[in-house]
Amino acid sequence: GEATQHQILKTNIRPRKVTRIFISHTHGDHIFGLPGFLSSRSFQGDGGPLTIYGPAGIEQFVQTSLKVSRTRVSYPIKYVVLKEDGLIFENNLFAVYTARLDHRVPSFGFRVVEKPRPGELLMDKVAEYNVPNGPLLGQLKAGKTITLSDGQKLDGRDFLGKERPGRVVTIIYDTRPTENIGKLADHADVLVHESTFNGDEEKMAHRYFHSTCLDAARIARDRHVRKLYLTHISARYTGKAGKELEHEARKIFKHTRLANDLDSFEITLRG
């Protein structure tokens, strides 16, 4: 969004630590802050390569902005153009999926899925083998095979409880209600959903390819989401009017909050 490089200064996030950026669509309020952020990242020293995921046109926008402003970045930028629904990134910690939404320009939602966590270490079972505290216990907890002082080998996987599912965060920006939102939001721990209008403005929301707070709440309810955060609120809803959107959505889905810049929320593991 706009002024990203200014807001990020108020957090403990360092631009050079950011290695991937996901852009939903190319409307100005979602990309005008990108050139400034890229420049700030360069000023802070070499942060290494950066990958930008976004719809067609995002590379042209960035390169033109940097060229016209004669801004030189000190690191390579790779562009991944979003075209098809599905997996777009994966490492050993999490995976990111995308699906096309319904907006005036190509727009995409994102589902971030954390990899499953190892189960809890079964200490009663560990005690039977007199495993000492220290590195060996840590390796066992990580599911690795260890060798005791008497030569006996223990497979860490035999000492762990049931694997715990990772957390899921779904981010939905500019769109009208569409089936793909449900697919991305299904059983998410957190759903961040655009809420440009209140429930009384359903026709206007449809005309301008946006959603209401009630649209977001219905998705959260029907797709068994744990928590819903409303964002992308129209400027007409300031102060108490903004809180009214939250109150309205809670009538359908009680675990709803209005998101503000710099808010911080903990996402707990299930179970």
Which residues fall in each region the model found?
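Active-site metal-binding motif and surrounding structural segment of the metallo-beta-lactamase
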Residues: 2-53, 81
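Hydrophobic packing residues within well-ordered alpha-helices of enzyme cores
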Residues: 8, 34-37, 62-65, 181, ...
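Active-site neighborhood of phospho(di)ester-bond hydrolases with catalytic His/Asp-centered motifs
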Residues: 19-26, 54-55, 170-175, 192-194, ...
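Active-site neighborhood of divalent metal-dependent phosphoester bond hydrolases
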Residues: 46-83, 236
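Generic structural signal for residues in well-ordered beta-strands
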Residues: 77-79, 96, 256-258
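Binuclear metal-ion centers of metallo-dependent hydrolases, dominated by the metallo-beta-lactamase
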Residues: 85, 178-271
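Short, surface-exposed amphipathic charged segments that create phosphate/polyanion-binding patches used
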Residues: 89-98, 269-271
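Active-site-proximal loop/helix segment associated with metal-binding centers of metalloenzymes
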Residues: 93-171, 175-184, 190-192
